[in-house]
């Protein structure tokens, strides 16, 4: 039987697999903010990135290892393909962390071996123990993954897993890389590994899954029943294609249905001991932080963290909830940190009050960043009577958590109406302060603004998404704009908030342009799609 830590270990891969969502690229400061909040949330392992991808990714993992890793904090993990160059970069990046892990992987399905790796099973059998052993020279804690395990020959999996454990892997991860498997099949796969790998008792069994068929969470819960004790998941379920298993859904399923899952851990059904180490009251805060910084909007009907998760429209439901919330709610909103508390910040509030509230929301800003956020706060407070938590979150994500800006928006003016052709005048300043102005016509004010910005940037970009939502209530509410641009197949997002949605749209477009330029310089490689060019 696989090693059992007595509870479920939560392995968060928001900063690695989650960041692979189209348009969700994060800069260094954003990654640090999310990593710090994940530590407060109580995750056991943070997969901080793929260090070999680029110098920027290496630096981000290294900084997280330095600033977030600690004796009492989470294990800091880096991803590495089964190559010495990848593993060496990963080992060096995570070195500052007192608790660290190298997560190395290789594809094991026949379709991946033939068409991606162009290697035989015999070659992979030689590679796996050698690379796990090499990873052990950098970190005592090594995890090995069989990429596309769900479509691999089980007997081949058993052989590779036994070799990896013998070489020193303490965690064996079984990924459903393309979201193909069903819960009963996944349970049988985990059970088969548990029964047919002779040394499986020396390792913890982990699972990783994608949501292409909407089954990721269900698959994981079935895997737990069959012996899996580590779940690799992301905040809000973000990730490539249809995303990953959602951390908040898994944790709350284990929390709410604890009496059902307790016996699978050898516990009494009514044992009150939590099945994870997650501080559930931090879930909503973490969800909003990730949504704000990635620009990935949470769907309103998303379980646990969606805007409608605790809303009731039906009169019958409303009546029942007013009499007793348990009639239609299985989760207390306060359990996940959702409260009706309204902060009383306004134009007379001082810097200390703003800083204190930002810290409560999970933002640990430098002095310069705090000054910038406070200036934006005062500007907004002159236009709004009351500033809410969502306003503060919008200020920080739009004003502070941005990559080094190639362009600064100086001015935006539009003229439009029933008899006027929409016209926009935009002024941008570059890094040395030189200003340029452009005028453009469009089908509407936002289209005109985007065309003017493209002319100043010197390249045309494909606008694939423009969305506006109200951050708070009232006629003076901030309008938050999200814009996604596509250039050469890559997607970059920008978001901004303002009481004037046209100004917000202009700033969001500039933020997306700056992010595009920032990541074009990094030019990171993809851990699964790019072939290994380094020598094994």
Swiss-Prot record:
Keyword check for Glycosyltransferase, yes or no. no
**Pathway, according to UniProt?**
Amino-acid biosynthesis; L-leucine biosynthesis; L-leucine from 3-methyl-2-oxobutanoate: step 1/4
Q: Extract one GO BP annotation from the record.
A: L-leucine biosynthetic process
Task: Offer an example of a GO molecular function term for this protein.
Answer: acetyl-CoA C-acetyltransferase activity
Sorted keywords for this record are: Amino-acid biosynthesis, Branched-chain amino acid biosynthesis, Cytoplasm, Leucine biosynthesis, Manganese, Metal-binding, Transferase
Q: Which PROSITE patterns match?
A: AIPM_HOMOCIT_SYNTH_1 (PS00815), AIPM_HOMOCIT_SYNTH_2 (PS00816), PYR_CT (PS50991)
| Top-level enzyme category | transferase
Domain Pyruvate carboxyltransferase residue range list: 8-273
Q: Where in the cell is it found?
A: Cytoplasm
Q: Which CDD domains match?
A: DRE_TIM_IPMS (cd07940)
Which Enzyme Commission number(s) are on file for it? Answer: 2.3.3.13
One Pfam family named in its UniProt record: LeuA_dimer
* Reaction catalysed by this enzyme: 3-methyl-2-oxobutanoate + acetyl-CoA + H2O = (2S)-2-isopropylmalate + CoA + H(+)
A single GO cellular-component term on record: cytoplasm
Q: Which cofactor does it need?
A: Mn(2+)
Query: Quick check: keyword Amino-acid biosynthesis in the entry?
Result: yes
Give each disulfide bond as a residue pair: none
* Family of the protein in this entry: Belongs to the alpha-IPM synthase/homocitrate synthase family. LeuA type 1 subfamily.
Q: How does it assemble?
A: Homodimer.
Q: Which NCBIfam families match?
A: leuA_bact (TIGR00973), PRK00915.1-3 (NF002086)
HAMAP family given in the database record: LeuA_type1
Task of the protein: Catalyzes the condensation of the acetyl group of acetyl-CoA with 3-methyl-2-oxobutanoate (2-ketoisovalerate) to form 3-carboxy-3-hydroxy-4-methylpentanoate (2-isopropylmalate).
Q: What protein name is recorded for this chain?
A: 2-isopropylmalate synthase
Species name = Prochlorococcus marinus (strain MIT 9211)
What gene name does this entry carry? leuA
